[in-house]
Amino acid sequence: MKLNTLRTALSAALIATFALAGCSSGNNTSGMDHGSATPGASSSASTAGQFNDANVLFVQMMIPHHQQAVDMSDMIVAKSGVDPDVTALAKQIKAAQQPEVHTMETWLNAWGPKPMPEGAPHHLLSEGMLDEEQMQALDEDTGREGQRRFVESMIRHHQGAIHLAEKEIAAGKHPEATALAGHIAASQQREIDTMNRLLATV
């Protein structure tokens, strides 16, 4: 899959999150709790009760983070000559994370417009996301080099996701968001363990 068909970390994925969250000019209520989700939203969002800024930040950051993992997985699945275990892992990652993106988008819509924090692109890069040059290299690499780059990059990517999830678990108030964060931390650690084993063979 060519890079120009993908929503990369610092372009369309972040732009989509900006659009979804809304760049409102309202007051920044950093650290404050907010009321229940917007009436009329999906039952998943509307029945979960209170949320706070930690929940909003978690979702704003995790949506593009997850989307890049999906894009990376699409890249490796499209390549020929990739170890079947690596392809299977990529498909597993996409199958897990794409629905989670949709869930988080629902929450963000229900919570209403919130400005994206300044410095978000830089912060996401520090949480394991690939920049455009790294995504280009992943897209262009073939054979053993390509699959090793994917596995090594995804390990760092997962480590960043776990770090974001741990912050949400510690500070978030929305019960379903914190539950999702716990699931992300546990499932991605298992995948890191799998990828570390794969590095010995690919």
Task: Briefly describe each language-model feature range.
Residues 1-10:
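Bacterial N-terminal signal peptides that target proteins for export
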Residues 19-22:
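C-terminal motif of bacterial Sec signal peptides marking the signal peptidase cleavage site
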Residues 25-202:
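All-alpha RGS (Regulator of G-protein Signaling) helical domain and cognate RGS-like helical scaffolds
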Residues 13:
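Short, flexible, mixed-charge glycine/proline-rich loop motifs
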